[in-house]
């Protein structure tokens, strides 16, 4: 439901000025913001003034088909878009990477060679993969807080919120087949929204380019511009004969969407209007200076160092074996992605002086808040952050070290399943684990990262178990020799013979003991304290958020991203990352050929692409480059405010047609989860014409093109 921005909940609390209610006269930056689609009518005037030709109802409607009905949450952390009347779905290569890997083997290396289903029968099912369409979203604050009064405690408030949320979810999911719902807190609990989804779980792999296209540039180019990565994969949604969600079955038929995106062949020019429609994961736009300082000065540097150790170990062994490269390709990409992002985030925060800027803002807020209920918020937050820091540090080290030891995590999970009599579940875990496990990588990472834990984490946070093991073996290296040498979980055949009756032996195994002892330490010595302090901080942020809205009543506050559907709009724009340097907003095939190097894995393109380039056989996908010669567009950048989760999001032009799919941000702008800078923040998108060129000229899969609708 749409509201006008001023609400009073039933408790008679202070009036809260909500983000969408007042068009900003003091909005921080023109293209900053991740806006709720159901309230987009509050922004549509600004969007139209910048060139958008459609209405708010075209973007989001519950009464008629709208663009929202062509956008999906892909899996649990990406976005995808429907591009045909037969359920064809486009997302990023890195979003579908796990599925491509699962179908790959040395004999059928779809990661290396790509995969294209030339018929419906060849499309590959993906157990566990689902896509979710948003049916509707609405403000349910009054429903969720019904029964709460100011004299109740926070624990009682939590109970009321939980009970009311569960009841509401139960009611709305009974409305039809395949429905699931969530109730999400916005503005730190000042507002609650219901999100109702229809989830389809028969999603089949249709096509993916080879990694030399879909992952071109690898980790070297990740987060960077200019970019030349063909980061896309294609799936198809299937439904039962009535178009309802259904488990995989050969009897299922392609899903018929309410709406799908038409594809623009008109290309992009500097200044063109763009908007990204997707599911951004997490932002922290409103945290105070002390929270930012911890991120940039302590957390990011520590995590970068720990992941460097793991990446170096993986790289060493992956370069020596094709089998190991396949096994660890997805894991390596996962570790490297955040590793590089944190580096850019840290640099951006420091370059912008975000900590100092927030401190100055806090001084002005404190002066305004004198004599009000908000006067003590900032000192209390500052004190809580100081108390929280060592626990957060210990938790982050645990996550990046002990919790990342593959063998121990696996052993602990299998032992738990077997002890509970779940032999089938244990067998499934084992099959997936051993397929993609290489002991030397795991052991090498253990030695490096656990050594860092012992050195960097204050001794008061060292588990007693760890102290005993180091005293016993004398060094982390010797400890690793014993653990990996003695654990039966390094042997798949031995694990396959385990039964529930072997519980004592399993729990005495060094790998299981490692996992369990660290979990117990974290559960008793870290988590309870961190949870309590974070809870106190969140409660204060609820008041601080409300105070900021009263302090700046003309500013448009958008809710932090939380993996719910958002609209971010901006324009095609280059940028200057350094003095004397300007990056144009479009990259082309010429850049791919400049980077092409058969001696470097990440830059070794398919021979077929070299042949097409030599013959200039570009077909209808050709454009005239800056040098006046024919080329093919590859990627572009724009000023849309995006985050993790926006991977695979449709990038849409002024007429609502698809011009690309979002897949990254520029490295200099990765601090946009905390502070958006219009000079540096750019989202990187794959030009839809390069997708079509790849399907047509490299894959020769023109049957897919025939499903699509093109506009100029």
Predicted regions and their residues:
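Terminal presequence/propeptide segments associated with secretion/organelle targeting
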Residues: 2, 6, 21-712
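Bacterial N-terminal signal peptides
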Residues: 12-22
């Amino acid at each position: 439901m749409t509201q006008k921005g001023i609400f009073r909940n039933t408790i008679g609390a202070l009036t809260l000025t909500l983000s969408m209610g007042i068009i900003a006269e003091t909005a921080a930056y023109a293209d900053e913001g991740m806006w709720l689609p159901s309230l987009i009518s509050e922004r549509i005037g600004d969007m139209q003034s910048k060139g958008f030709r459609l209405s708010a109802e075209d973007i989001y409607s519950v009464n008629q088909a709208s663009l929202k009905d062509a956008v999906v949450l892909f899996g649990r952390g990406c976005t995808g878009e429907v591009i045909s009347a037969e359920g064809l779905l486009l997302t990023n290569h890195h979003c579908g990477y796990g599925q491509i890997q699962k179908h790959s083997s040395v004999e059928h290396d779809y990661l290396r060679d790509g995969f294209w289903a030339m018929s419906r029968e060849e499309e590959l099912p993906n157990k566990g993969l689902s896509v979710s369409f948003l049916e509707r979203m609405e403000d349910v604050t009054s429903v969720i807080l019904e029964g709460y009064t100011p004299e109740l405690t926070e624990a009682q408030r939590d109970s009321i919120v939980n009970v009311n949320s569960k009841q509401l979810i139960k009611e709305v999911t009974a409305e039809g087949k395949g429905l699931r719902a969530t109730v999400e807190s916005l503005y730190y609990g000042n507002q609650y929204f219901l999100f109702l989804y229809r989830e389809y779980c028969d999603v089949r792999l249709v096509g993916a380019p080879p990694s030399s296209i879909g992952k071109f540039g690898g980790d070297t180019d990740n987060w960077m511009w200019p970019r030349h990565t063909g980061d896309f994969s294609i799936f198809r949604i299937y439904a039962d004969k009535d178009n309802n969600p259904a488990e995989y079955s050969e009897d299922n038929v392609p899903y018929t969407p309410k709406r799908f995106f038409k594809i623009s062949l008109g290309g992009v020019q500097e200044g063109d209007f763009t908007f990204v429609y997707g599911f951004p994961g997490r932002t922290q736009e409103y945290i105070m200076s002390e929270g930012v300082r911890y991120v940039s000065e302590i957390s990011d540097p520590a995590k970068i160092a720990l992941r460097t150790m793991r990446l170096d170990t993986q790289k060493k062994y992956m370069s020596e074996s094709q089998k190991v490269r396949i096994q660890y390709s997805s894991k390596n990409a996962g570790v490297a992605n955040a590793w590089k992002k944190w580096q850019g985030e840290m640099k951006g925060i420091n370059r912008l002086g975000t900590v100092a800027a927030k401190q100055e803002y806090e001084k002005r807020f404190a002066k305004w808040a004198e004599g009000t209920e908000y006067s003590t918020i900032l000192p209390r937050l500052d004190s809580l952050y100081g108390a929280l820091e060592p626990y957060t540090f210990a938790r982050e080290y645990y996550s990046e070290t002990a919790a990342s030891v593959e063998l121990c995590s696996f052993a602990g999970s299998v032992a738990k399943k077997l002890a509970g009599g779940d032999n089938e579940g244990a067998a499934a875990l084992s099959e997936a684990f051993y397929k993609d496990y290489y002991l030397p990588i795991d052991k090498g990472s253990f030695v490096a990262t656990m050594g860092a834990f012992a050195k960097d984490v204050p001794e008061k946070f060292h588990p007693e178990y760890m102290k005993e093991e180091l005293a016993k073996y004398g060094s982390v290296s010797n400890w690793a020799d014993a653990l990996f040498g003695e654990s039966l979980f390094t042997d798949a055949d031995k694990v396959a013979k385990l039964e529930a009756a072997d519980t004592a032996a399993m729990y005495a195994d060094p790998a299981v003991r490692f996992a369990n002892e660290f979990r117990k330490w974290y559960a008793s010595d870290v988590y309870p304290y961190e949870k309590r302090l974070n809870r106190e901080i969140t409660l204060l942020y609820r008041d601080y958020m409300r105070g900021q809205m009263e302090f700046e009543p003309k500013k448009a506050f958008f809710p932090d991203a939380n993996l719910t559907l958002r609209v971010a709009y901006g324009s095609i724009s280059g940028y200057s990352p350094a003095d004397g340097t300007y990056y144009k907003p479009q990259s082309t095939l010429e850049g791919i050929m400049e980077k092409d190097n058969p001696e470097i894995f990440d830059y070794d393109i398919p021979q077929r692409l070299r042949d097409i380039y030599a013959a200039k056989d570009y077909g209808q996908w050709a454009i005239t480059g800056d040098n006046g010669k024919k080329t093919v567009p590859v990627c572009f950048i724009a000023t849309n405010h995006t985050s993790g989760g926006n991977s695979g999001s449709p990038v849409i032009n002024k007429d609502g047609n698809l011009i690309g799919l979002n897949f990254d941000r520029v490295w200099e702008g990765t601090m946009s989860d905390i502070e958006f800078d219009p000079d540096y923040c750019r989202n990187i998108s794959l030009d839809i014409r390069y997708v079509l060129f790849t399907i047509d000229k490299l894959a020769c899969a023109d049957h897919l093109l025939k499903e699509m609708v093109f506009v100029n």
